[in-house]
Amino acid sequence: MKKVDSMNILDIIENIKIKTIYGSLPTKVNNISQDSRKITKGDVFVAIKGYTVDGHNYIEKVIAQGAALVIASRYEDYNVQDCAVVVVKEHEIEKIASMLAKKINSGNKVHTVAVTGTNGKTSISTLVHNMLRELGESSSYIGTNGFGKNDDEPIYLGNTTPDVVTLHNKIGELHREDIKNLAFEASSHAMVLGRIYNVDIDVAIFTNLTYEHMDFHGDMQTYAYDKSLLFSTLGNNFSEAKYGVLNKDDEYYSIMSKCLYHQEINYSVLDEVADFYAYNIKQYSENGRYKTTFTLKSPEGEYECQTNYIGDFMVSNVLAAFIAVWLKGYSVEKLVNILPNLGALYGRMEILGEDLPIDIISDFAHTPDGYKKLLEATREIRKNKRTLLLTGMGGGRDISKGPLIGEIISEADYVVITTDSPRDEDVEVLMGTIEKGMTHKNYEKVWFRTDAVKRIIQLAEPGDVVILASKGREDYEILQGGKKVWHSDPVVAIEEAKKKFNVK
């Protein structure tokens, strides 16, 4: 890990008004982390009490490793001869951690786009990144697919939105490497749990709000409120231009609009008075590749657009990303011209194995609305063809959506129900939640996902469409006891299909 510049510790903690200090504060610190394994001499350790791990259990360990400062919400009789422990209110610790992390990273200012919504976060943040790269700008992204810089392979971070210290450290890393842009996914969990505190956001995007995470939020109104917290991060400082980009087609649009104190730019595929409106949407196939065209009405006039994605919802995602990049000062015409150059989004309506006699589509759909849009978007591809669909329910997730998912995916001719990182939950219960909603008997259950992918490919015949849903490009499964094993839907499916159809 690259060291950050040391700075005076008194400058770091001067704004923390309610605290108790044990030991002597150091005059300088180096890095900051919530992960005890990353602490070395002169570092700051933030002891967060999480759902499964309590950082306070590692305070003695980090002191032995040479930590200069520990931020905690409770104190025991630690040996603080060479370390200071600052105790603060438990519900304030993420805020204070963000202040420290931001200051240690020298303000870590990069142009930042944050995307929130039930569906579309990964697609939009990736599109923003890809558009900026196509325009020759340095860029990065953080989200479900990990942390990626420019054209490098992403590094897996664990959560869609990492903890607040990691997020600030990554932004600081970008600043030091002179990478000018960041697009990141802001999950509702992240906002409630304080993972984006003190991040300077320039553009905040809202995609949509549909049934999901009820085990965490409780009801849709609370879910909407928690999503709207993103716009509070823009603050009331108007010395720098900040914007909210909102999907006018979503039923929660008006709530988000009211929570936005900065300028709003909205988009739609239904409302012609939206700031950016896409209509005349058409999907077609060219040399085995599926494309979408549409007419764009914008503040700079109307333009004919072409993308390499399918589905009206992907047009909405393109509009959101398009606006975020347009707000940097590019002309609409210039951005329209680069759209055909943008390649497939890994695991998002991704069509695999073009040399195979079957169509294989990989998608991350994992909510009722996501499945509905997935099936709508692929309807033209599936026309007069047999559709086989694989889906899985994850462990440690909201399973109340299972029956509705089962009902929606019953549109497919045949379904293979499996799991998606079952963790410590009963696989029969997980699969059973989806099974409850099935409206026909043309399905089977195969709990281990690798076997399930192989099974659905074995069932496929030339001309069929195989949809692999709920996982996208994730390359692992988490099993009982937290055991992590390799698995990739696309890799397993293509290998199995090539064997079955004797394709080299």
Predicted regions and their residues:
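Short glycine-rich anion-binding loops that position phosphate/pyrophosphate groups of nucleotides
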Residues: 50-51, 76, 188-189, 211-212, ...
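ATP-dependent carboxylate-amine ligase
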Residues: 1-20, 41-44, 320-347, 351-504
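Glycine/threonine-rich flexible loop motifs
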Residues: 52, 56-58, 193, 215-222, ...
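A short, gly/pro- and small-residue-rich
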Residues: 55-67, 86-91, 202-208, 223-228, ...
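Phosphate-binding loop of NTP-binding sites
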Residues: 13-14, 94-248, 252-262, 319, ...
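Acidic, Mg2+-coordinating active-site environments of NTP-dependent enzymes
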Residues: 76-81, 203-360, 435-440
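Short acidic/polar active-site loop segments enriched in Thr and Asp
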Residues: 68-69, 180, 202, 413
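N-terminal leader/targeting and accessory segments in enzymes
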Residues: 1-103, 251, 279, 306, ...
